[in-house]
């Protein structure tokens, strides 16, 4: 499941996004917030996998919110906004995608597939690192055995 958090200052936009995301069985909506500051606390508490984020919000913009998230807690981010002028900035902060409102269901499906692909690649990379760590430990252990002469038990009793 993709644990998802929605952030938009417009309740109607949140409702629309919830409705669209319900069509995707692997997406679990963990929360929806109209305030970026409340969303920041939810990100810290819930650790979502995915964040759908509006850009222009009162008090704190979507970009401001992103800048306050610790790197190790950074979810995948898809910006959902009515303004196309922020697209380059969105990709500068490594957003997975940038959706224009009103959100087209097929574009949303493409965004979710990108998220799935990135999650899969990240999981494979983590597995590769764990596998490499195990190999390294085994090689260190084998190196420690290099030059050790095996001792055999003498089958004759008393020796």
Task: Describe the function of each predicted region.
Residues 1-12, 17, 21:
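Conserved acidic segment of CheY-like receiver
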Residues 4, 29-30, 77:
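Hydrophobic/aromatic residues located in beta-strands of well-ordered beta-sheets
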Residues 116-159:
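Conserved binding/recognition cores within well-folded domains
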Residues 12, 22, 37-130, 134:
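CheY-like receiver
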Residues 1, 74, 148-149:
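A structure-centric signal for secondary-structure junctions around beta-strands
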Residues 7-8, 33, 51:
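Conserved sequence signature across two-component system core domains
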Residues 26-34, 42:
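Short hydrophobic/Thr-rich beta-strand motif most characteristic of the beta2 strand and flanking loop
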């Amino acid at each position: 499941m993709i644990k998802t958090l929605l952030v938009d200052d417009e309740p109607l936009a949140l409702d629309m996004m919830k409705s669209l995301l319900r069509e995707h069985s692997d997406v679990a909506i963990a929360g929806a917030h109209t305030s970026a500051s409340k969303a920041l606390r939810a990100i810290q508490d819930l650790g979502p996998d995915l964040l759908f984020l509006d850009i222009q919000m009162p008090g704190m913009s979507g970009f401001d919110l992103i800048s306050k998230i610790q790197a190790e807690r950074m979810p995948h981010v898809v910006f959902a906004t009515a303004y196309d002028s922020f697209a380059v900035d969105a990709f500068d902060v490594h957003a997975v995608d940038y959706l224009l409102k009103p959100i087209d269901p097929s574009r949303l499906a493409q965004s979710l597939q990108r998220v799935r692909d990135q999650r899969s690649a990240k999981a494979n990379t983590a597995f590769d690192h764990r596998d490499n760590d195990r190999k390294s430990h085994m090689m260190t252990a084998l190196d420690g055995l290099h030059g050790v002469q095996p001792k055999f038990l003498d089958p004759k009793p008393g020796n």
